[in-house]
Amino acid sequence: MLPTTSVSPRSPDNGILSPRDATRHTAGAKRYKYLRRLFHFKQMDFEFALWQMLYLFTSPQKVYRNFHYRKQTKDQWARDDPAFLVLLGIWLCVSTVGFGFVLDMSFFETFTLLLWVVFIDCVGVGLLIATSMWFVSNKYMVNRQGKDYDVEWGYTFDVHLNAFYPLLVILHFIQLFFINHVILTGWFIGCFVGNTLWLIAIGYYIYITFLGYSALPFLKNTVVLLYPFAALALLYILSLALGWNFTAKLCLFYKYRVR
């Protein structure tokens, strides 16, 4: 399913937006429209957001093809519907409560962990990564010059959210069923299962991030975004050889946070 919004009107003579339409398409106007829709659930397309979440696991290329469609119809790469962000927030809250239950935390400790995870791990780290990638991509990866070839900050944040969602589901939901009875048993199989889930989750993040930037036709050398795979594979092998259980360390970190 694709949005049916009509193409942004342009001048028939030179293809340039009229002053009125140009104002409507400024970053500030787009940001205001996005934030305004955040408080109007009836205006959000949750069905389409769920479709995107499914395809981020099975065929993430299809998700970015829709970003191309949005650029053609609405003259912007970034999402203008916060439904995906809202659903991601719900996933984050539910999975964090699940972590609190698995780690035998009190209500207050679980609530404190939820605040940390939402505002620091998701929002704070997301803003930092998006801003860093926005700066790097515009400064070093743009193949052409001009306003039409700028990487939108909102798009870099969307790419982060797209990549973060599979990581969240794998590490904050699927992993919950293995923590107490497999991963934290102290056996090698526990370390293997836990670290393999981390390998898959971070691998998804790297790959979906690469797809997001390679989808922009005016960027060059996007293949460098796949280079971390080599370090990831090396770290995975090293962690198994040395017995580093990343999930055990995450659980200790979460418990330390809520003290």
From Swiss-Prot:
The record, for Pfam families, names:
UNC-50
Entry GO MF terms: RNA binding
Composition skew (Polar residues), residue ranges: 1-11
The record gives the membrane topology as:
Multi-pass membrane protein
Instruction: Name the InterPro entries on file.
Output: UNC-50
Cytoplasmic face of the membrane:
1-82, 131-158, 203-222
Question: Transmembrane stretches, by residue range?
Answer: 83-103, 110-130, 159-179, 182-202, 223-243
* Predominant location category: nucleus
For region Disordered, the annotated ranges are 1-21
- Localisation per UniProt entry: Nucleus inner membrane; Golgi apparatus membrane
**What are its GO biological-process terms?**
protein localization to cell surface
| Alphabetical UniProt keywords | Golgi apparatus, Membrane, Nucleus, RNA-binding, Transmembrane, Transmembrane helix
GO cellular component terms, semicolon-separated: Golgi membrane; nuclear inner membrane
The chain's Lumenal topological domains, given as residue ranges, are 104-109, 180-181, 244-259
Family, according to the entry, reads as follows: Belongs to the unc-50 family.
Task: Outline what the protein does.
Answer: Involved in the cell surface expression of neuronal nicotinic receptors. Binds RNA.
UniProt name for this protein:
Protein unc-50 homolog B
Source organism per entry reads Xenopus laevis (African clawed frog)
Organism taxonomic ancestry: Eukaryota, Metazoa, Chordata, Craniata, Vertebrata
Gene name per UniProt = unc50-b
